[in-house]
């Protein structure tokens, strides 16, 4: 049984009902409907911390979905799961793929910056100030791009850029 048919959460049930109604009204192909169902089930599983199940649903949604914009969000969510699992290299790969399909995805840029900043902090802890600066500069680059796309969404990142003197670069 699809996850969307066994939701116990009122909000999830409501979303599922509304989404099902929209899928009936909006002219879409059966393939698009199936892709959306897998995507929706992936989001539901992800929100409950069921990452393996979420990934299976997202991979199936990717197999079915042909629209690059919709694929970008599937890829972004796969990146989120890999980030949560500490698999930063994989996460970065999926964020890059998402941005290739949808360059206006500031949240992917932000998450890439957060990973780079984290790697910079790790380098400092290991006494590697040279690599930490490389990671911090990369984080700054991603945050600047995210801020350009969504100016009011990343205030903390903007403050970090100012404090570290990276805002002007």
UniProtKB/Swiss-Prot annotation:
Compartments, record wording: Plastid, Chloroplast thylakoid membrane
Protein topology in the membrane: Peripheral membrane protein
Keywords on record: Chloroplast, Membrane, Photosynthesis, Plastid, Repeat, Thylakoid, TPR repeat
A GO CC term attached to the entry: chloroplast thylakoid membrane
Gene3D superfamilies: Tetratricopeptide repeat domain (1.25.40.10)
InterPro entries tied to this protein: PSI_Ycf3_assembly (IPR022818), TPR-like_helical_dom_sf (IPR011990), TPR_rpt (IPR019734)
PROSITE patterns: TPR, TPR_REGION
TPR repeat spans: 35-68, 72-105, 120-153
Pfam families: TPR_1
GO biological process: photosynthesis
Protein's job: Essential for the assembly of the photosystem I (PSI) complex. May act as a chaperone-like factor to guide the assembly of the PSI subunits.
NCBIfam families for the chain: PRK02603.1 (NF002725)
Family to which the UniProt record says this protein belongs: Belongs to the Ycf3 family.
Protein name: Photosystem I assembly protein Ycf3
Source organism per UniProt: Staurastrum punctulatum (Green alga)
């Amino acid at each position: 049984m699809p996850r969307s048919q066994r939701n116990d959460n009122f909000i999830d049930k409501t979303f599922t009902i509304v989404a099902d109604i929209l899928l009936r009204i909006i002219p879409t192909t059966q393939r698009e409907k199936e892709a959306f169902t897998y995507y929706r089930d992936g989001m539901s599983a992800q929100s409950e911390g069921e990452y393996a199940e979420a990934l299976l649903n997202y991979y199936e949604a990717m197999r079915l979905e042909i629209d690059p914009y919709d694929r970008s969000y599937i890829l972004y969510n796969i990146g989120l799961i890999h980030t949560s699992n500490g698999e930063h290299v994989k996460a970065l790969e999926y964020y890059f793929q998402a941005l290739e399909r949808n360059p206006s995805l500031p949240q992917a840029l932000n998450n890439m910056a957060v990973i780079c900043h984290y790697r910079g902090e790790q380098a400092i802890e290991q006494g590697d100030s040279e690599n930490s600066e490389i990671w911090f500069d990369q984080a700054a680059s991603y945050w600047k791009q995210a801020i350009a796309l969504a100016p009011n969404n990343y205030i903390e990142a903007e403050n970090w850029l100012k404090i570290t003197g990276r805002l002007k670069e």
